[in-house]
From Swiss-Prot:
This is ATP synthase subunit alpha. It comes from Helicobacter pylori (strain G27). Keywords: ATP synthesis, ATP-binding, Cell inner membrane, Cell membrane, CF(1), Hydrogen ion transport, Ion transport, Membrane, Nucleotide-binding, Translocase, Transport. ATP binds at G170, D171, K172, Q173, T174, G175, K176, T177. It catalyses: ATP + H2O + 4 H(+)(in) = ADP + phosphate + 5 H(+)(out). GO terms for cellular component: plasma membrane; proton-transporting ATP synthase complex. Belongs to the ATPase alpha/beta chains family.
Amino acid sequence: MSQLKLEEISSVIEEKIKNFELDCDMAEVGKVVSYADGVAKVYGLNGVMSYEVLEFETGDKGVAANLEEDSVGVIVFGFGNNIKEGTSVKRTKSLMKVPVGDAVVGRVLNALGEPIDGKGEIETNEFSLIEQKAPGIMDRKSVHEPLQTGIKAIDALVPIGRGQRELIIGDKQTGKTTVAIDAIINQKGQNVICIYVAIGQKESTVAQVVRKLEEYGAMEYSVVINASASDSAAMQYLAPYSGVAMGEYFRDHARHALIVYDDLSKHAVAYREISLILRRPPGREAFPGDVFYIHSRLLERAAKLCDEKGAGSLTALPIVETQAGDVSAYIPTNIISITDGQIFLETDLFYSGIRPAINVGLSVSRVGGAAQIKATKQVSGTLRLDLAQYRELQAFTQFASDLDEASKKQLERGQRMVEVLKQAPYSPLPIEKQVVIIYAGAKGFLDSVSVKKVVDFEEQLHPFLEAKYPQVLEEIHTKKALDKDLEAMLRKVLEEFKLTYSE
């Protein structure tokens, strides 16, 4: 056996000492003082940032919401069943991030951006902070491109443009979610990525929405974020911010996105719950003073960017539920003042068979004609006024029976226009078909058709056009306007169809 030389031993030891690295992990650690209702009070984290992600030794995570002199109020994701007094909490020195990009499209995620659809992990290296500054004035461009919903009453009377924030407001069970889902279904082939954020909804309702989107092939370009009623208030509060971060990725990469928040009433309630547990002073309706700010900073992130920034857009459709039609409550008035218009859905209209139950008088788009193609403007120019006069006459006829001819004519035309604007759920209509049927109603082609048969007239008109005169629809689609020749051709087609149509 060969003896080890002294020099060899010393050189090996020297080499080991030279290459030795002390593998220690430096972390700022605090202790939980108290934990209740999803909020932990933590002592010993003096350098923590506002809304920094913190890790508990139990594996739970949370964000630092209240930074006090001697403690930190931490909102815990999930229910934190194993967190108790004395549990260690360490800083991550990073703010809340979610996965973004094409990898999330077609998936159902929770508020933290984790998949909950059983289709495996999201493979992406791209993450984005959920709290971002909204684009400034100079980075924006005025809304000028239409975002068609496929709903006649909206595209003709309260048009939505790319980059707009349009509120959908109404009592429960008036078809608010259906309007939003129709808008998502209608984006097929339009190169618009859609994000549906469900806040405080029943799991069964969200599953139904996902099934509908899959049925109409809309999941291919959609993301669903679910913070259901069974999730903690923290998850419900975070969900819309995670959703908008995903939408911003497409906006900032010169693409177009549409985000639906369903609904912000429940979001405000979740935030109220968190704030009261954090012992922040309550204000009107027990909401904290900054409840306006949580919604304004969320909705301001929807924008149409200027050409220098890539001309991308993020359109927001927030939904708010009212109680007994009271739009003057705290949260509805807040969000009405933040958004660029509202679509008001009414219970009375819904139960009288007018669906979508849009109250044309109270609904408004502050973008207006800028978000419409010229053809729609041409056919629906006086539609709002005509419907308003019809409603006035209708109220008058309840007291007076004898009407002059002009009033009778106006009343009959109005009844037919109300029928024209009716639409079945999940059946959005291409803009060229909308132009044709609204033109037919506005120009008196439906005057001889009985009111009950207007919907049937429309159902037969579209296949007739597709079979015999597809060029009419194609021309409206490409020209986006009705010139003299096209209008003459459209009149001829409608007259021909009226001869063949039998009630």
